[in-house]
Design a protein with these regions (language model features):
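An N-terminally biased module of ancient metal coordination in phosphate/nucleic-acid-related enzymes
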Residues: 20-107
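Acidic-and-aromatic substrate-binding clefts and catalytic sites of carbohydrate-active enzymes
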Residues: 63-71, 89-98, 121-130, 169, ...
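H/E-rich (His + Asp/Glu) clusters that bind or coordinate divalent metals
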Residues: 67-68, 75, 223, 229-237, ...
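C-terminal motif of bacterial Sec signal peptides marking the signal peptidase cleavage site
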Residues: 14-17
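Active-site gating/metal-coordination segments in enzymes
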Residues: 27-31, 44-49, 99-217, 270, ...
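Acidic/histidine-rich helix-loop elements
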Residues: 58, 62-69, 123, 161-163, ...
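Hydrophobic faces of well-ordered beta-strands that scaffold small-molecule active sites
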Residues: 56-61, 85-89, 112-117, 147-149, ...
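Sec-dependent signal peptide recognition
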Residues: 2-8
Length: 314
């Protein structure tokens, strides 16, 4: 009897040990989604478009060159891909005055067009728009065809150079004379309003934009920072209050998640346009709806890249 009890005790101990041993995890439990790189093995027809069927105007780019000679390579890439003209936006993060941005591109004439920033230095001191308008006129005389890229992600136009426009939203009354001057000079305004909607949502397992959202998450807790809807209100105010001025909302107005709403705004405001730059992934989530939207509003939609200057990018 003792032998049986000893044997049973030993067996139970062995089973217990087996249960506590950690089993090796399979690849589905250890592979990070960020590292997942599936290779498509489906034998289906594929189309690679290497050159645009019709000449293309890229309405949203920046001064990406590190040296003047890089402009030559950029033009070669444009020629190879059928890009007739590129519009270069000026922002605070460019780091150079407007006239210095233009200089390296001069030999290519109309292959490049330039948009200027706004100087808010005086406006933020005493509310006057005089110096801002004078700078706008100066840039226009030098060749600026528009204003932008402005950028308001909640705290005002922080893309402006040389003075960032903290607290200056696009519907600020102090800017109204500037928008009137833009209309007079036929200079449209390109503005980056907010960020993609899912960046404002909880960064958890339900967020379908989590990989980017976790990195670029919008901190709306900053002082006087407007949220997504608050920013959309400022943009609509500007459209309504300045009907003679053209406003271009870049990146689909960051409204890819609600194309019916975006379309309704285009229907309501004839002075509103959008560009499609830097939102390929967001548009790809709803390919059929996006296609229908682009066809319906093709006269109000501008092509743009905002993503470098290589042929591969185009």
């Amino acid at each position: 009897m003792k032998r049986i009890l000893v044997f049973c005790a030993a067996a139970l101990a062995l089973v217990g040990c087996c249960k506590t041993q950690e089993q090796p995890k399979g690849i589905t439990e250890t592979l990070l989604l960020n590292d997942y790189r599936p290779v498509n093995v489906n034998n289906i027809p594929q189309t690679f478009v290497e050159k645009a069927k019709y000449p293309v105007i890229d309405m949203h780019s920046h001064d990406y060159i590190a040296a003047p000679e890089e402009v030559d390579a950029w033009v070669e890439a444009m020629d190879r891909c059928g890009v007739e003209q590129t519009h270069i936006m000026h922002c605070s993060w460019i780091g150079k005055p407007f006239e210095e941005v233009m200089a390296p591109y001069a030999k290519y004439g109309d292959r490049f067009k330039f948009w200027c920033s706004l100087d808010y230095t005086q406006m933020l001191k005493d509310g006057s728009a005089d110096e801002c308008i004078a700078y706008l006129e100066k840039c226009h005389e030098m060749g600026a065809v528009g204003v932008g890229e402005m950028g308001d992600k909640g705290q005002g136009d922080l893309y402006a150079r040389p003075t960032e426009g903290y607290g200056l939203h696009i519907d600020d009354p102090r800017l109204k004379p500037v928008w009137a001057k833009c209309a007079e000079l036929k200079m449209p305004i390109n503005i980056h309003v907010g960020e993609p909607y899912w960046m404002y949502l909880p960064q958890d397992a339900t967020n379908d934009g989590l990989p980017n959202g976790a990195v670029w998450h919008v901190d709306t807790t900053a002082a006087d920072c407007l949220g997504y809807e608050g920013l959309m209100v400022t943009f609509e105010n500007a459209l309504r209050e300045n009907p003679a001025t053209i406003f271009i909302a870049c990146h689909y107005l960051n409204m890819n998640q609600d194309l019916p709403r975006l379309g309704a705004m285009l229907d309501k405001y004839p002075n509103m346009y959008i560009d499609i730059s830097a939102r390929v992934a967001e548009a790809a989530q709803t390919p059929r709806a996006t296609r229908e939207f682009l066809i319906k509003y093709q006269d109000r939609v501008l092509f743009g890249t905002d993503n470098g200057m290589s042929a591969q990018m185009y």
